[in-house]
C-alpha cells in the first residue's frame, strides 16, 4: 500500500503534517485541493487554504475505503508532477 500511494491521486484525500523542518506546519490538517511539482494545497476545516512544500515535510495521508487506513509518507518521495510520478521508478530512501 505504501508504494502505491506514490502513484495514487492525492487530491481529495485528508492529510496531516506529522514532521517538518518548519515547526509551524506540524499538526496542520486538511483536504488536498491541488498539487504541483513541489507543493500541496490544503483546505483546512475553517475554509482557509495553505500551501505546503513537499520536500520539507512528512505527511500522514488517510484513505477511506472498506476501513480507514493512515500512511505516513516522506514528502521527498512525492516531489514531482503528479502525472510524472506514475512513470517514475520508486527510489527507496530507507532500507527496512
Swiss-Prot record:
Pfam families: RNase_P-MRP_p29. GO terms for cellular component: cytoplasm; ribonuclease P complex. This is Ribonuclease P protein component 1. GO terms for molecular function: ribonuclease P activity; RNA binding. Consists of a catalytic RNA component and at least 5 protein subunits. Transmembrane segments: none annotated. Optimum temperature is 36-38 degrees Celsius in the absence of L7Ae, 48-50 degrees Celsius in presence of L7Ae. Keywords: Cytoplasm, Endonuclease, Hydrolase, Nuclease, tRNA processing. Part of ribonuclease P, a protein complex that generates mature tRNA molecules by cleaving their 5'-ends. The keyword Metal-binding does not apply. Its EC number is 3.1.26.5. It is found in: Cytoplasm. Belongs to the eukaryotic/archaeal RNase P protein component 1 family. It catalyses: Endonucleolytic cleavage of RNA, removing 5'-extranucleotides from tRNA precursor. Its main location: cytoplasm. It is an enzyme of class 3 (hydrolase). GO terms for biological process: tRNA 5'-leader removal.
